[in-house]
């Protein structure tokens, strides 16, 4: 099962993510934040709130309670 072991804020809406399958990459959440109408996602437009996350339950969880599945986060990795 895919999970996130570690995550570090990079810049803007980007987070460096370390997966248990060995992949390390930069996930860019800017398009999601700008295009999703869900209130919890829209709150992350505040960059200070975006920076407030932790790795819990094998994924990234923001202080407003929002989280995404590790598989979705992996799809956000810059190629």
PLM regions and their residue ranges:
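Motif-centric detector for short Cys/His coordination patterns
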Residues: 1-79
């Amino acid at each position: 099962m895919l999970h996130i072991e570690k995550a570090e804020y990079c810049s803007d809406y980007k987070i460096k993510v370390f997966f248990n399958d060995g992949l390390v990459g930069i996930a860019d959440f800017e398009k999601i934040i700008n295009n999703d109408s869900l209130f919890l996602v829209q709150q992350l437009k505040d960059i200070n709130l975006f920076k407030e996350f932790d790795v819990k339950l094998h994924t990234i969880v923001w202080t407003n309670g929002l989280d995404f599945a590790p598989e979705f986060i992996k799809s956000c990795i810059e190629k």
